[in-house]
Regions:
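Bacterial N-terminal signal peptides that target proteins for export
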Residues: 1-7
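C-terminal motif of bacterial Sec signal peptides marking the signal peptidase cleavage site
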Residues: 13-16
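Residues within mature, well-folded domains
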Residues: 18-106
Length: 106
């Protein structure tokens, strides 16, 4: 019984130390990947996978892709696309603190 409790406690500690991720990894969009007034929802799904979140902002449909990796340091990237009534990109924003993005986007 005591051994089982010790084993359970070790498993809890090891699980707490594991890296936590939220969302799916997706590539940073190149500057010409998303073209306002041209890029469709289907193209975005092909490029980045299904969005993590969907919503409405000031009457426009929005899709958001989020990837969070807990560790030291904590890393986050987010892509948000706003759509026209026709379902094409109206505007988008991308932010990240991943080292590779920090180097290429600065």
């Amino acid at each position: 019984m005591r051994r089982m409790g010790l084993l359970l406690m070790c498993l809890v500690i090891l699980t707490a130390c594991a890296a936590l991720t939220v969302g799916r990894e997706f590539p940073a969009p190149a500057k010409d990947t998303i073209r306002n007034g041209v890029t469709t929802k289907a193209e975005l799904v092909r490029l980045f996978g299904e969005p993590t979140q969907v919503g409405i902002d000031d009457g426009d449909t929005t899709w958001t892709w989020v990837y969070f990796k807990h560790g030291d340091p904590q890393l986050t990237k987010q892509l948000q696309v706003r759509f026209t009534d026709r379902g094409v990109a109206k505007s988008y924003s991308y932010s990240s603190n991943f080292p590779e993005d920090m180097r290429t986007l600065k």
